[in-house]
Regions:
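Helical "lid/coupling" subdomains associated with nucleotide-phosphate turnover
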Residues: 1-149
Length: 149
């Protein structure tokens, strides 16, 4: 986007080849838009349901391979994650595996995990009408001057 090859709607303005066999195409951009919109809309709707602002979020932990390879600044620049949270984003690797290992060897941590699971609320975003509306709104990319906000 910084190079002007992708507009704010996600349209690839010209082909982009990294090498003769590795290139970026419109389908790649669309897949990114779908993921970006889902994450951005999910954050907005969950904050709305809890009655908080994104600025109130203390930490953002990104787990798994996604977190290992995610560049936080780029995720904020494209609107996937709120820019206000940039300095609070941490990649934590294989959180599920590490949590299972800790719970397996530490009874106290196992009990804490159970208590946390019992008070965790499941939200079915895919069935939420507001989520669908925000999801569609989040498909585009911020214009260049919005990246730093």
């Amino acid at each position: 986007m910084k190079q002007g090859r992708i507009d704010e709607t996600g349209r690839l303005t010209e082909p982009y080849y990294f090498t003769s066999r590795v290139f970026l195409n419109q389908r790649d951009i669309r897949e990114l838009q779908l993921a970006k919109a889902a994450i951005a809309a999910g954050i907005q709707i969950l904050c709305q349901k809890k009655g908080i602002r994104t600025e109130d979020i203390e930490r953002v932990l990104i787990a798994g391979a996604f977190g290992n390879y995610l560049d936080s600044a780029s995720a904020c620049a494209i609107g996937m994650l709120p820019s206000a949270l940039l300095d609070r984003i941490t990649s934590i690797g294989n959180a599920a595996g590490e949590g299972a290992r800790i719970a397996a060897v530490n009874r106290e941590q196992f009990e804490r995990s159970k208590a946390l699971a019992e008070k965790t609320e499941f939200v079915e975003l895919a069935l939420d009408v507001e989520f669908q509306e925000v999801y569609v709104d989040e498909m585009g990319f911020p214009e260049e001057e919005e990246h730093g906000e």
